[in-house]
Every structure is written in C-alpha cells, then in structure tokens.
Amino acid sequence: MKKIYLLLLLSASLGFAQIPTGYYSTATGTGYTLKTQLFNKIKAHTAISYSPGLWNLYYTSDVRPDGKVWDIYSDCIFVFGTFAATGGNQDTGTLGSNECERYNREHTFPKSWFGGPSGVPMYTDAFHVMPTDKHDNSLRGNMPYGIVGGTSSYTTNNGAKIGICTAANTPASLIVFEPADQYKGDVARNYFYMATCYEDKIASWQKITTDGDAVLDGTSDHVYENWYLNLMLKWHAQDPVSQKEIDRNNAVYAVQGNRNPYIDHPEYACKIWSVACAALNTNSFELIADINIYPNPSNNQRVNIETENELDDIQLININGQIMQEIKKPSAQNHTYTLENLPKGFYFLKLSADSRSITKKIIIN
C-alpha cells in the first residue's frame, strides 16, 4: 500500500496549481464518508446541452498538442467541426462506417445503463462523455470495459480490443472493450467520478441492462462489483493522471462548475475503497512508483528516465499506436536512461521490467 499511495500522491501534485483554493476543504473523511463529502461538493453542476454544448466544449477539453481532436478509442487524426463548416470530421449523420472517418460523443459510462437521454444530467455530463471514433463507439455499444486476454474480435487503430473478458472473477463469457493502455486510467477515473457525483442515483441503475448489472452491485457506496472495482483501481494506478486529464478537468470545470476529484486527488480512490486497494498486488506497482521522467514537456528533443529498476525494454509510441523507437536491454548511467533526438510531437513511453510495464505520456516541443 505504501507504494500505491506514493504513486497517487506524486500524481496528485501535477494538478495542485489548478485546483481552486478551498475546493476540497470539506473532504476530510475516509472511506464512504469521504465519498459522500465529495458527492456533496460536486453534485450541483451546470448541465450543458448535448448539442451544441458538448461539441463546443471539446474544442478546449479534448484538443491534442497538434490541435486535432483527442480520441481515446483510435487516436485517429480528426479535425474539429463539421465538414461543411471547417472541413472537419464531426459526426453529422453521414459516414463513420469505417474507422477514422468521423468522431462523435461517447458515453464511457454507457447511457443505457442509466436510462438513456432521459437520464439528466448524466446524459450530457462531459466528465464521462468524450469524443471518440464513431465506428469504434458503435462497436463498443454498451459493453463494459475489461481485459481481453485471448483472441480479440476487433482491434482499433490504437490497439483497443473487443473480446471475452479474462479479468479475475468476471461473469462467464462477458464481452468487453479494452482501451489502449495509455487511456485505461482515464476511463477508470471517469467511473470513480460517476460513482461519486451520482451517489444518490446509481444504486437504482443495476437492473436496467444486463451489461450494467455485470458491473454495478446495486449499492450507493461500494457501487461496483468487486471484479470491476479491482480492475478500475488497477488501471488507476498503472496509468497515472496525465497533463491531458488535468487540462480536461479544468476545461470541463469552466463550463460545468464541478471537478473530477480523482484527477485532482488520485489518492482519494484508495482512501474510499481501501479494502479493494489492500487486496491489490503491490509488487505490480513498484515499477510505477519509482519512475521519474524529465523534462516533460521537453524543449530540447531529449528526455531522461530515472528509476532504480533495471528496464528490459523502452518503446516510444506515437499517437496512432505505431512504435517509433524500441530499445531492448537499454543501458543506464546513474540509474538514468536517456532518449535523444526525439522529433516534435506527443508520444507514449512504454517501459517494461520483470514482466511489469507502465505507459507514460510525454510531449516534445
């Protein structure tokens, strides 16, 4: 547990400068008491419109460093706006039967689980409604997120997969959508947010759909079935809060007037669901807690990876999921690995050691 908390506390420090003074002053408890305190803080917010509200928000909440739409399902290159207005890729009801043609609005927490468009304000809550590839969104449908351990029936442009879930204690033959590693923490924190912001409603959603029933446990405090909560906590630790999420949190706050506490304070997840956190294998997080990447963003085409771990493999992956550079058995000096002559852009660094891996987001200016 010490190493998990170290990771989460380090991640939390990224966003402190952006959190309004005193915003979490009433969040003083632990366990479900803390969750209810957070519920009371974030439940009241401005419900924005489905259209044009969400479309307009995405210009500031989901913009990549290159100015394109940030799509977590495919990382396809999408231009903001409609084709008629800007030559963009926003969905207008045409195209999208193939990947990388159109982006639309994805309820990462499926809307059918809470009753569809009648579920207000959940239906337009930007913290979980994100821009994604229209084709991939349609294929995911109402599937829960999960781990596809065997053969996948479909793989997206950035490596997300659809197939039978192999996470521990999963319902038999459950078909799930597994996001790319670099976005697993993002969706996990969406689910913690939904469990908290809608604490007064979520217990009643369990039996609305079969897929929702596989994930929800019918309570307002624990909220999720153990298999799903354990998976979300694992992803929360393996893919720490990034600058992308911090920027998105601030952009949504500017419009909705509330925040995602688990982006501002990642440590809250284990303070609330402490029993589930304690059940996790802390060895799997040792690599994550012991890595420092700097400078990030980098202005000199160079990044340093400082860690006490002996890395087996370093992969530099672009936003389309392509491996741009791979170093097997890299050498370190004073526990520091250095990558040089990196081209400008946004990348993912996948670091592996002793069958463990972690993906970090980096920007080269």
Where are these regions (language model features)?
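C-terminal tail/sorting-segment detector
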Residues: 3, 346-365
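Residue-level detector of functionally pivotal "anchor" positions at catalytic/ligand-binding pockets or at interdomain
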Residues: 275-294, 307
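Short coil/turn motif common to extracellular beta-sandwich-like domains
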Residues: 296-304
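N-terminal module-boundary/linker segments of secreted carbohydrate-active enzymes
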Residues: 18-79
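Domain-level detector of nuclease and nuclease-like folds
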Residues: 95-104, 111-279
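Short, surface-exposed loop/turn motifs with a glycine/proline- and acidic-biased composition
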Residues: 328-354
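Short, glycine-anchored, charge-dense loop/turn motifs used at functional sites
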Residues: 316-324, 347
